[in-house]
From Swiss-Prot:
Family recorded in the similarity comment: Belongs to the 2-oxoacid dehydrogenase family.
Top EC class, one word: transferase
Organism classification: Eukaryota, Viridiplantae, Streptophyta, Embryophyta, Tracheophyta
Sorted UniProt keywords: Acyltransferase, Lipoyl, Mitochondrion, Transferase, Transit peptide
Gene Ontology BP, a term: pyruvate decarboxylation to acetyl-CoA
Name used for this protein in its record: Dihydrolipoyllysine-residue acetyltransferase component 2 of pyruvate dehydrogenase complex, mitochondrial
Domain (Peripheral subunit-binding (PSBD)) ranges: 248-285
Length: 539
């Protein structure tokens, strides 16, 4: 079977590599037991592939065959910090694949169904932002097919094999496309393009079709009910009372009751299983109950003013932000620690450094750059806060990667400054400006925001917010909220002496499963020390 597939396309270079690497495992990749064999041999794919994708050979003869191939995403590399056995299995089990189909229909030549790829660990669906190729265009490995809007950013999706784009299944602007859902068809021969003009993608639920055949049992039940409807009505009347939360009524009965402002709960059904029918509503109205229920509702309706509103559709980033933050507040036991830090010395050091920067033609250093550096060094000093909770253990990270919250017109992004504890202030500033610009242009790639271990959110400088509590960015265990600096009158050295100093409020949100209160306080003490003695950050 393996040789038959390889002979079909000379461009399956990765299959040849797998055969040379481990013939036995590669053969299993072409069988129906593909996934079990992959679980134990992830090292093969880590060594050979710089992307993760699953290609399924559909309907080759009478069986289905599965293999690894590629939709290059230029982003989800298995060598990244996010990659590991668990993440790899998630990609393998996902439906991100391209499908080479040997159709059972003689009208369809061999083709490839390209599915919506999973471009980030949290991605479950995506949108087609823009098609860069048209139907009929020739495609080559490395060429960009389309731009996919993920839960984090807009990512270019590249083609892995040479051929022709025969059919665009999901048009430009299509939204909420599930991972694995077919978005396009490619063929090897240009003459085959026209054969896919009216093509409908194959269903992934095909194997479940035979299981749905027990449907004929439904008509049997209906036939039994109809002749016994009269006696059953008397028996089932009492049973309608307990199910107060759900009232069974015919559509016509519901409409009639609604038009006359009659609550269905006040009507006793005489139909099968206590079902309320039209005659029951008419009998209720005829009994004189109509007036007592209709008049109050008319008075209420007359006093309710009409609301003027507009419905704004959710963007992909908005839906993901809502989902992740709701998950965070529902599952992470937050607690908050606030401290005031004197920033006079930090502002003085910043002025000196900016003088050097201007003289050398460099960019100015911001307060946020100093805050990121101080947070990174404090994490190195108190590594318990640079951790993540799992059900089996607490994972403490050796890298200090700081996510920085950036608000854009499209939504909230959190790009990451990696190894911030090892970088200088000017380097941190350059990276933050570069990532913020990419976020505003909606051009962040997965490697720009994945792998963070701690988050900093600053609403003080840009918006003048004095103090706030931020929501933890899962799976991290803490987030630092930066408020604005303000001048305060503080006691001087003498009994009647007073000085003016600038103070900034910072609040640390902690996951109590990971960080105990004393540990969080220890981290804030270290952070405050770096802010109030900024020269120590340069050591």
């Amino acid at each position: 079977m393996a040789s038959r597939i390889i002979n079909h396309s000379k461009k399956l270079k990765h299959v040849s590599a797998l055969l040379r690497r481990d013939h036995a495992v590669a053969v299993r990749c072409f069988s129906n037991s593909t996934h079990p064999s992959l679980v134990g041999r992830e090292d093969i794919f880590k060594a050979r592939l710089n992307y993760s994708s699953v290609e399924r050979i559909s309907k080759c003869g009478t069986g289905n065959v599965t293999m690894l191939s590629g939709i290059s995403t230029t982003s989800t590399k298995l060598s990244s910090p996010m990659a590991g056995p668990k993440l790899f299995k998630e990609f393998i089990s996902s439906q991100m694949r391209s499908v080479r189909g040997f159709s059972s229909s003689s009208d369809l030549p061999p083709h490839q169904e390209i599915g919506m790829p999973s471009l980030s660990p949290t991605m479950t669906e995506g949108n087609i932002a823009r098609w860069l190729k048209k139907e009929g265009d020739k495609v080559a490995p490395g060429e960009v097919l389309c731009e996919v809007e993920t839960d984090k950013a807009t990512v270019e999706m590249e083609c892995m094999e040479e051929g022709f784009l025969a059919k665009i299944v999901k048009e430009e602007g299509a939204k909420e496309i599930q991972v694995g859902e077919v978005i396009a068809i490619t063929v090897e021969d240009e003459d085959d393009i026209q054969k896919f003009k009216d093509y409908t993608p194959s269903s992934d639920t095909g194997p479940a079709a035979p299981e749905a055949k027990p449907a004929p049992s439904l008509p049997k039940e209906e036939k039994v009910e109809k002749p016994a409807s009269a006696p059953e009505a008397k028996i089932s009347k009492p049973s309608s009372a307990p199910s107060e939360d759900r009232i069974f009524a015919s559509p016509l009965a519901r409409k009639l009751a609604e038009d006359n402002n009659v609550p269905l709960s006040s009507i006793k059904g005489t139909g099968p299983e206590g079902r309320i029918v039209k005659a029951d509503v008419e009998d209720f109205l005829a009994s004189g109950s109509k007036e007592t229920t209709a008049k109050p509702s008319k008075q209420v309706d007359s006093k309710v003013p009409a609301l003027d509103y507009v419905d704004i559709p959710h963007t992909q980033i908005r839906k993901v932000t809502a989902s992740r933050l709701a998950f965070s507040k529902q599952t992470i036991p937050h607690y908050y620690l606030t401290v005031d830090t004197c920033v006079d010395k930090m502002m003085g050091l910043r002025s000196q450094l900016n003088s050097f920067q201007e003289a050398s033609g460099g960019k100015r250093i911001s307060v946020n750059d100093l805050v990121i550096k101080a947070a990174a060094l404090a994490l190195r000093k108190v590594p318990q806060c640079n951790s993540s909770w799992t059900d089996e253990y607490i994972r403490q990270f050796k890298n200090v990667n700081i996510n920085v919250a950036v608000q854009t017109e499209n939504g909230l992004y959190v790009p990451v400054v990696k190894d911030a504890d090892k970088k200088g202030l000017s380097t941190i500033g350059e990276e933050v400006r570069f990532l913020a610009q990419k976020a505003k242009e909606n051009s962040l790639k997965p490697e720009d925001y994945e792998g963070g271990t701690f988050t900093v959110s600053n609403l003080g400088g840009p918006f003048g917010i004095k103090q706030f509590c931020a929501v933890i960015n899962p799976p991290q265990a803490a987030i630092l909220a930066i408020g604005s600096a303000e001048k305060r009158v503080v006691p001087g050295t003498g009994p009647d002496q007073y000085n003016v100093a600038s103070y900034m409020s910072v609040t640390l949100s902690c996951d109590h499963r990971v960080i105990d209160g004393a540990i969080g306080a220890e981290w804030l003490k270290a952070f405050k020390g770096y802010i109030e003695t900024p020269e120590s950050m340069l050591l």
